[in-house]
């Protein structure tokens, strides 16, 4: 699939001296202790995929416009000190910072900056305008409990949330796609989540979210955090933001947090099924139990060959 991320290289960026990663088209798990840079790695890869909506809206985007868009994206994702790009340059490094990503369709984006730079300098954008598959980033904290009014507040005020939270709220507020256009595995996953939660989350627009059972309706805030987290995945499938074989990579930071054992097992089953049907998934975790569920539930032949573990 041309939407998949194949290769990432980070040099003198944040805490990375020279990091090179090759990605599986299916499941990728980044493993490491707190503070090893897992979230930074996810955000860097996600940020380099940010050209997709830009080129969709303006196919003839110039280098200057692309540099401005990517710079703004990185600043909002990483929120460096004083909102300065140069603060993301690796401390004490003498060479420029370098970020590059290569995709399965041959598209590439590479950019550099120094510790005094105000904007990224694009060095290579080979066929990058052809990469138009939008990606999804699910942050560690669930967002259903504070979605109402969040997007307008985020645009108006300097909230202490990085842009992954605004991005996910915007995707969750999209209307659902027609049922007949949903992937069969998406329908299956949504039904499984509804079954284990005992109901479903309903999105009314404007960030208003409730939880409905057969006989009653409740505030989303009254539901367990693990259920809200599962509800986010279900909604992303319902809106088509995650569409196996069509959408770009799914980045998920610590998907296991606040999940009970039954929910964690179901989550792994769903992620494996989505990956088998063309969805690239890139996770970050330090949880042994999550890794064990992948080990127990994956197909020992096919899944093992296409699942990649990277420790940081």
Stretches found by the model and what they are:
Residues 1-54, 210-308:
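Switch/communication elements of ASCE P-loop NTPase nucleotide-binding domains
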């Amino acid at each position: 699939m041309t939407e998949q991320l194949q290769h990432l290289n980070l040099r003198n960026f944040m805490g990375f001296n020279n990091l090179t990663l090759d990605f599986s088209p299916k499941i990728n798990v980044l493993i490491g202790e707190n503070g090893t840079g897992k979230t930074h790695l996810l955000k860097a890869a996600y940020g380099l995929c940010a050209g997709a909506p830009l080129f969709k809206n303006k196919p003839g985007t110039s280098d200057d416009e692309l540099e401005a868009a990517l710079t703004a994206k990185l600043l909002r994702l990483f929120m460096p000190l004083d909102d300065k790009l140069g603060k993301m340059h690796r401390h004490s490094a003498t060479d420029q910072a370098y970020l590059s990503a290569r995709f399965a369709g041959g598209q590439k984006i590479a950019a550099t900056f120094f510790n005094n730079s105000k904007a990224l300098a694009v060095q290579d954008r080979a066929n990058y305008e052809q990469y138009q598959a939008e990606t999804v980033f699910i942050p560690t904290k669930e967002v259903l409990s504070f979605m109402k009014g969040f997007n307008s507040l985020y645009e108006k005020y300097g909230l202490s949330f990085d842009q992954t939270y605004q991005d996910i709220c915007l995707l969750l507020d999209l209307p659902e796609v027609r049922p007949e256009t949903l992937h069969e595995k998406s329908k299956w996953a949504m039904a499984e989540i509804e079954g284990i939660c005992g109901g479903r989350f309903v999105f009314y627009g404007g960030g208003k979210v409730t939880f409905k059972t057969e006989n009653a309706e409740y505030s989303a805030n009254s539901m367990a955090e693990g259920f809200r987290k599962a509800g986010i995945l279900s909604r992303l499938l319902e809106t088509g933001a995650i569409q196996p074989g069509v959408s770009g990579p799914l980045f998920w930071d610590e998907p296991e947090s606040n999940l009970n054992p039954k929910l964690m097992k179901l989550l792994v089953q769903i992620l494996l099924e989505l990956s088998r049907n063309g969805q690239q998934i890139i996770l970050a975790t330090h949880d042994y139990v999550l890794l064990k569920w992948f080990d127990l539930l994956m197909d020992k032949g096919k899944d093992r060959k296409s699942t990649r573990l990277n420790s940081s």
